[in-house]
Amino acid sequence: MKVDLTIEYRGKLITPNQIKLLIALHKTKSQNEAAKLLNIKPSSFNIQLKRLENKLGVKLYYSSPNGTVLTDAGLEILETYNSYSKRLKNHFFTVSGFVSGEIAKILFGNPIITSFDNALKLLKMGFVDVLGVDDSYWIYRLGDERFLKSEIGSCDFNIFLIAYDNFVMVSKKEFNYKNLVGIRFSSQRIVYNILKKEGIKFKVKVRVKNPFRAIELVNEGYSLFLNESLLRYIDGDFNVIYPNFYEKTVHAINFISFGKDIEIDKKEIKKIKKLGFKI
């Protein structure tokens, strides 16, 4: 029984293994037979099912003359799973961070571009075939089997390093290291580590998830370390400075593929370079 989709029910995530419990019980109408189908002990099956009920706060099954059957809530969960499963078979979903999203628009046409915490939520729900990652730190985390099991369950994936980017200094007036706007889930951590090593004092006054919101805040007087590939989005009267440690800010833009191949032709490479990325 292959189930690799996580769904949400009443604000709680139901994992693939938990969905298997309901599918097996619905199919066999017997906890003992369902346990055999899943190759686990009946006691283990019952414990897992009880835990799922406690987690969701609803009754999922009851005894009847026809055997052990699912309640309306249990059937609703399976209907939701089947609906999502059918949609996924007919669609290809690319989800990217804001920087990798610039590349994803070239490679995949119509990606979902969002903050990485939202991307992880979609990944947990099984809605991601290709994931664009702005910060290589998350490549490390996703490569940790313990993180995968706790967040999305076990799965196989391939990592594709597509391009490199650097950071530049953007400000309305004079760049102020002590009045920075930070971007969550970006590779700005690389810059902060460099500043610490260089002995440059700095302070992040406000943090946002969206680099385009960060660019707007530059108009309010904040200074920003921005991905060079996003320079085309800034106002013409902004100051742009390439720091002395510019070369040290280089970082990879990766894509994670869950069972899909990623191939790039020469035309796409040319377009990616035109955006300001390095390949």
Curated annotation (Swiss-Prot):
Keywords assigned by UniProt, alphabetized: DNA-binding, Transcription, Transcription regulation
Secretion signal span: none
Residues in the DNA-binding region annotation: 31-50
Every HTH lysR-type domain range: 14-71
GO annotation terms (biological process): regulation of DNA-templated transcription
GO molecular function terms attached to this record: DNA-binding transcription factor activity; transcription cis-regulatory region binding
Pfam families on file: HTH_1
Record-stated family: Belongs to the LysR transcriptional regulatory family.
Name used for this protein in its record: Uncharacterized HTH-type transcriptional regulator MJ1120
Species per Swiss-Prot/TrEMBL record: Methanocaldococcus jannaschii (strain ATCC 43067 / DSM 2661 / JAL-1 / JCM 10045 / NBRC 100440)
